[in-house]
UniProtKB/Swiss-Prot annotation:
Organism this protein belongs to: Desulfatibacillum aliphaticivorans
UniProt key word Metal-binding: yes
Family recorded in the similarity comment: Belongs to the RecR family.
Toprim domain segment(s): 81-176
Matches recorded under Pfam families: RecR_C, RecR_HhH, RecR_ZnF, Toprim_4
Name of the protein this chain belongs to: Recombination protein RecR
Summary of the function given for this chain in its UniProt record: May play a role in DNA repair. It seems to be involved in an RecBC-independent recombinational process of DNA repair. It may act with RecF and RecO.
Zn finger region (C4-type): 58-73
Molecular function as annotated in GO: DNA binding; zinc ion binding
Keywords: DNA damage, DNA recombination, DNA repair, Metal-binding, Zinc, Zinc-finger
One of the GO BP terms on file: DNA recombination
C-alpha cells in the first residue's frame, strides 16, 4: 500500500481497526470518502467526534445514552415492575424495534466467556443485584443470546437471583441457536418475548 499517499494509508489503517472491516474493505471505504465532498468527509468526522464525546452508559441500565439516566429509564409510562436483561445495547435496540417489550432494561455489557477471560466480575451483574434491592422489580426477563455463552450467562443469573423474591423468566426459543438478538427480525423477537418461561 506504499503507493498511496501517507494520509490515505493512515485512513485505511484506521478504518481497518473497525470490527468486520478488513484491509480491502477499509481501502474501498477510504476511497469512497475521498471521492465524496469535503463537506461530507467533515460531517462524518464530526459525527464520530460528537458520538465519542456525548454517548455514555446510562447509570441505571448501562445502555448507550446521551443523557443520564437514559430516555427509557426516565419514561414513567413503561412497566416499572419488569426488567429485561440483555448482553449488549444492540440487543436492547433490537427488542425496542420489535415493540413487544414495554418494561425497562439492564445491559450486562457482554456475556460469560471463560475462554475469552470474561467472568461475572467483568459484567454488570453486581449492579443488577443492587438494582433489584433498591427498586420494586417483580420480574427479570433474561434475554441473553442462545449461544453457549448466552445460555451460561442465563443459568448463572438464575443461580445468582434465586431467593431474591423476583420472578425470573427466560425468553422462549424462536431466536435461532447461536444467533444474536441484533440480527433477529421483529416478529421472531415478539414471539420469543410472548413465550418466555421461568428458568
Amino acid at each position: 500500500m506504499s503507493f498511496y499517499p501517507p494520509s490515505l494509508v493512515n485512513l485505511i489503517k484506521q478504518l481497518s481497526k473497525l470490527p468486520g472491516i478488513g484491509e480491502k474493505t477499509a481501502e474501498r471505504l477510504a476511497l469512497h470518502i475521498l471521492r465524496g465532498s469535503v463537506k461530507d468527509a467533515q460531517a462524518l468526522a464530526e459525527s464520530i467526534s460528537e458520538a465519542k464525546e456525548t454517548v455514555r452508559l446510562c447509570s441505571v441500565c448501562y445502555g448507550l445514552a446521551d443523557s443520564d439516566p437514559c430516555h427509557i429509564c426516565r419514561d414513567a409510562t413503561r412497566d416499572q415492575d419488569v426488567v429485561c436483561v440483555v448482553e449488549q445495547g444492540t440487543d436492547m435496540v433490537a427488542l425496542e424495534k420489535s415493540g413487544a417489550f414495554k418494561g425497562r432494561y439492564h445491559v450486562l455489557q457482554g456475556c460469560l466467556s471463560p475462554m475469552n477471560g470474561v467472568g461475572p466480575d467483568n459484567l454488570r451483574i453486581r449492579e443488577l443485584v443492587e438494582r433489584l434491592k433498591k427498586e420494586k422489580i417483580k420480574e427479570v426477563v433474561v434475554a441473553t443470546g442462545t449461544s453457549v455463552e448466552g445460555e451460561s450467562t442465563a443459568n448463572y443469573l438464575r443461580q445468582v437471583l434465586e431467593g431474591s423474591g423476583v420472578k425470573i423468566t427466560r425468553i422462549a426459543s424462536g431466536v435461532p441457536i447461536g444467533g444474536d438478538l441484533k440480527y433477529t427480525d421483529a416478529l421472531t423477537l415478539k414471539r420469543a418475548l410472548d413465550s418466555r418461561h421461568c428458568l
